[in-house]
A protein has these predicted regions:
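Intrinsic-disorder/low-complexity, polar/charged segments enriched in Ser/Thr/Lys/Arg/Asp/Glu/Gln
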Residues: 17-23, 54, 66, 80, ...
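A short, structured loop/turn motif at beta-sheet edges
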Residues: 30-31, 60-62, 86-93, 113-122
Length: 171
């Protein structure tokens, strides 16, 4: 398994020629990280990191439902992604497709897993691409730096939810 040089607190690995594995610990309970991951108004607070503003965050959280995020980057261009949910286990696991609308032929399947120990959450994202070329293009896009920023923002949003959602919140 190859490791990428990570600049933030998420660890990025390349387990196979078609996969990207991202692991990040959060100082927040998993139901809070999950809530921030699936809630459109919260997604708008973290998904773009420091790179722009999320103008669209749509989530139809059900198997067969869709999601779509659009960000207007600081340099003025628009970046959009969408996908379809394939599996949902509230507070535990989400499997969905992911399509960058700039290259719609490069669909990936993301498996997002939330685990908790001692009040801390480990988020694991396995991105499965159809071929090595798509995986390599994903890496070359600069995704790692933006993802690191987004994960930092996600942690802040999840921590901010502690007083609002102190129970076990589902989907």
């Amino acid at each position: 398994m190859a490791a990428m040089a990570s600049s933030g607190s998420a660890v990025v690995m390349l387990p196979t020629d078609t996969q990207i594995l991202i692991t990040r610990e959060f100082d927040a309970a998993k139901h809070l990280v999950y809530k921030a991951w699936i809630t459109p108004e919260l997604i708008k607070r973290w998904w773009s990191g420091d790179r722009g503003e999320v103008t669209v965050a749509e989530v139809d959280l059900r198997v067969g439902g869709t999601w779509r995020y659009v960000m207007v980057a600081n340099r003025g261009f628009e970046v959009a992604f969408h996908g379809e949910f394939r599996e949902i286990v509230p507070n535990e696991r989400i499997v969905s497709t992911e399509v960058y609308e700039g290259t719609p032929e490069g669909q990936a399947v993301d498996t997002i897993t939330f685990t908790e120990q001692d009040g801390r959450t480990t988020l694991t994202i396995l991105v499965q691409h159809e071929c090595k070329e798509h995986r390599d293009a994903h890496i070359a896009s600069g995704m790692e730096a933006g993802m690191q920023e987004a994960m930092d923002h996600l942690e802040r949003v999840a921590i901010s939810l502690h007083s609002r959602f102190n129970g076990d919140e589902g989907a």
